[in-house]
Design a protein with these regions (language model features):
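Glycine/proline-rich active-site loop of Rossmann-fold NAD(P)-dependent oxidoreductases
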Residues: 2, 7-8, 12, 16-29, ...
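Conserved C-terminal active-site "lid" loop/helix of NAD(P)H-dependent oxidoreductases
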Residues: 7, 62-86, 96-97
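Non-catalytic, hydrophobic alpha-helical segments
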Residues: 10, 14, 30, 41, ...
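C-terminal "lid/loop" region of Rossmann-like NAD(P)-dependent oxidoreductases
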Residues: 25-28, 39-42, 50-71, 76, ...
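PAPS/PAP-binding and catalytic site of the sulfotransferase fold
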Residues: 37-49, 94-98
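Amphipathic terminal alpha-helices
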Residues: 91-118
Length: 118
């Protein structure tokens, strides 16, 4: 499982930490606090895009078990205690906003797939 943040929530978290008093040197998570599997994420994207997909696992892409963190979910307790930050975007809202962004031809023309996907 993973814990995904929408980028606007992450940026708001950075700003909240930067503005907070007495947090220098603190390790502070910015997380949604919600676990989701990769399959659930893919199925939600397919639903948003109204796409019919087949789930295929490529054995070449499976990481060795000793190199993988199988469950990853952030704890927001510290950021919520030290700042007024709370996540505002659900996973579905963030995915919908992302899909909508990519559906806009003007945005897609600016997307540098050869730079971002190395």
């Amino acid at each position: 499982t993973r814990d995904f943040n929408f980028v606007k929530d992450t940026c708001r978290g950075f700003l909240a930490i930067a503005r907070a008093e007495g947090v220098e040197g603190e390790e502070i998570n910015i997380a949604s606090g919600t676990e989701v599997t990769m399959k659930q994420t893919l199925m939600k994207i397919a639903e948003i895009m109204d796409a019919d997909i087949n789930w295929v696992v490529d054995p070449e892409r499976i990481r060795p078990s000793k190199s993988e963190v199988f469950r990853l979910c952030g704890d927001n307790t510290k950021i919520e205690t030290l700042t007024d930050w709370r996540p505002e975007w659900s996973l579905e809202e963030g995915l919908r906003a992302t899909v909508d962004w990519f559906r806009n031809p003007d945005n897609l023309a600016k997307y540098k797939y050869n730079v971002y996907n190395r």
